[in-house]
């Protein structure tokens, strides 16, 4: 990964809400206004990362076209002004890698990626999921711990797993 993208990931990672109408359709014009407001009022290069389609943005409910629309909006509005990120919530490492490549090609700096969550994965399966995406896409990866989203009792990143993540080139 180009170190310049990884170096841009500094400060607060702000997960933006996804703005919808009452029928759950994206309101991209309003999303754009919100994004511009954040940039105009203090989110600048080095002060933080603007994250779209993350947990707060209900990224796990978006279809692929909606997700791509938000990625394209963020990349277009924030390019050269502030670091950017996008949430990825996929059961399949292959689908997660495809989204990570799309985000990288759009100019996004990092993905905030949750582990696969339908079945309770073990530590090796979670590591393999992140390694697959790391090897497939040239983009920073932020590990997103979501133990509340797992089957009981939940999966939590261990110290050992975090140390293993640190061996992956693209992990932030």
Residues covered by each model-derived region:
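Active-site beta->alpha loop and helix N-cap motifs at the rims of alpha/beta catalytic domains
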Residues: 2-156, 160-162
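Active-site/ligand-binding-proximal alpha/beta "capping" segment
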Residues: 158-172
């Amino acid at each position: 990964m180009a170190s310049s993208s990884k170096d841009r990931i500094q400060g607060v990672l702000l997960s933006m809400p996804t703005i919808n109408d009452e029928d759950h359709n994206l309101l991209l014009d309003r999303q754009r206004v919100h994004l511009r407001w954040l940039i105009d009022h203090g989110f600048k290069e080095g002060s933080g990362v603007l994250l779209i389609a993350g947990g707060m943005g209900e990224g796990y409910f978006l279809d692929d076209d909606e997700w791509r629309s938000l990625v394209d909006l963020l990349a277009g509005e924030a390019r050269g002004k502030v670091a950017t990120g996008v949430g990825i919530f996929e059961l399949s490492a292959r689908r997660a890698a495809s989204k990570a490549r799309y985000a990288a090609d759009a100019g996004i700096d990092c993905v905030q990626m949750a582990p696969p969550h339908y079945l309770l994965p073990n530590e090796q399966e979670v590591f393999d999921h992140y390694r697959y995406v790391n090897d497939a896409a040239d983009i920073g990866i932020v590990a997103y711990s979501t133990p509340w989203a797992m089957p009981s009792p939940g999966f939590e990143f261990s110290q050992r797993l975090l140390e293993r993540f640190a061996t992956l080139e693209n992990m932030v």
